Regions:
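Short glycine-/aliphatic-rich beta-strand segments at the starts of folded cytosolic domains
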Residues: 1-22
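Short amphipathic alpha-helix segments
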Residues: 21-35
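Short beta-strand
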Residues: 42-47
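Accessory, often N-terminal, substrate/partner-engagement and coupling regions
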Residues: 55-126
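Interdomain hinge/lid region at the active-site interface
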Residues: 140
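Conserved small/polar residues in nucleotide/adenosyl-binding loops
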Residues: 144-151
Length: 155
């Protein structure tokens, strides 16, 4: 799994606004990625402070995502690359846990992001662009978040 991230830590609000796609555009974006030759699963998380694309594919899939993101946002490819953080494998999964747990949020610990992630997953699932790997990752994040809150509530 890969995660291509542009967030409040790497970009300004002008850049982030260009990457905050409405649902119609998200659907087309996901379709363009999913029907490319090198991506088997994908979802996009857009909030006011981040746009992240989680995807499964080979090494060439990274350039595909960067290119499609550049095309959809209208941000020059080389300019966009300045704002991107790329995570792969275990680091991508760890990043997903950190994002969902609010650790990567502007206000550390806020929990609205988990709901946004669940909606992004449901949107991708409804559009047929997620399968086993991303499903397992999002389910693990949701379960861990629930267990952490239950445990903390009982302290």
């Amino acid at each position: 799994m890969y995660c291509l991230s542009v967030s409040h830590k790497t970009s300004n609000v002008v850049v982030r606004k260009k990457l905050a796609f409405p649902d119609e555009q998200k659907k087309t974006f996901l379709d363009d990625l999913y029907y490319s030759e090198n991506i088997s699963e994908c979802l996009i998380l857009c909030t006011c402070n981040r746009t992240e694309v989680y995807f499964c594919g080979d090494e060439s899939s990274v350039k595909t995502v960067e290119t499609v993101l550049s095309d959809f946002s209208g941000i020059d490819f080389d300019e966009l690359k300045k704002y991107i953080c790329l995570f792969y494998g275990d680091r991508a999964l760890l990043h997903l846990f950190r994002v969902a747990g609010g650790i990567e949020s502007m206000v550390i610990g806020e929990d609205e992001i988990l709901g946004q992630l669940k909606r992004a997953y449901a949107f991708a699932k409804d559009n047929g662009t997620v399968a086993y790997e991303l499903n397992m990752c999002v389910q693990a994040v949701s379960y861990t978040h629930l267990r952490a809150h239950e445990t903390l509530a009982n302290l």
